């Protein structure tokens, strides 16, 4: 029973992800900021969909932070520094099918506080 519930939740997240990706894309000036959330950590990257390259990425494991709101704020601050070093100040936020609440919302708000326009 539990396996079916988990499978259904994953299926619904992937469906949301596909709907979102059909509507947004990033370019060199306005990259798509994609977030992946695991049980232990967060991963965030800026993607140029036109050239299909990753412009910048931050891994929560390397920073030693957990997948909670405080960790999301630290990762976002580090990611904002990386983007500013590459002269990127505006981007499109891709929540990757996750609900815009909790950790994902804290990450986006912290990016905005650090000067990245989403």
Curated annotation (Swiss-Prot):
Q: Which Pfam families match?
A: Ribosomal_L18p (PF00861)
MF annotations from Gene Ontology: 5S rRNA binding; structural constituent of ribosome
* InterPro entries the record matches: Ribosomal_uL18_bac-type, Ribosomal_uL18_bac/euk
What cystine linkages occur within this chain?
A: none
Q: Which Gene3D superfamilies match?
A: 3.30.420.100
One Gene Ontology cellular component annotation held by this UniProt entry: cytosolic large ribosomal subunit
Question: Belongs to which family?
Answer: Belongs to the universal ribosomal protein uL18 family.
- Assembly and partners? Part of the 50S ribosomal subunit; part of the 5S rRNA/L5/L18/L25 subcomplex. Contacts the 5S and 23S rRNAs.
Q: Any idea what this protein is called?
A: Large ribosomal subunit protein uL18
What species does this protein belong to? Campylobacter jejuni subsp. jejuni serotype O:23/36 (strain 81-176)
Give the gene that encodes this protein: rplR
């Amino acid at each position: 029973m539990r396996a079916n519930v988990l499978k259904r939740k994953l299926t619904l997240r992937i469906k949301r992800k596909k709907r979102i990706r059909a509507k947004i894309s990033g370019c060199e000036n306005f990259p798509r900021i994609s977030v992946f959330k695991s049980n232990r950590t967060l991963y965030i990257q800026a993607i140029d969909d036109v050239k299909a390259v990753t412009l910048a990425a931050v891994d929560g494991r390397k920073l030693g932070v957990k997948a909670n709101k405080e960790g999301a704020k630290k990762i976002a601050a580090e990611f904002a520094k990386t983007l500013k070093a590459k002269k990127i100040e505006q981007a499109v936020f891709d929540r990757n099918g996750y609900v815009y609440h909790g950790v994902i919302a804290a990450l986006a708000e912290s990016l905005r506080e650090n000067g990245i326009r989403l």
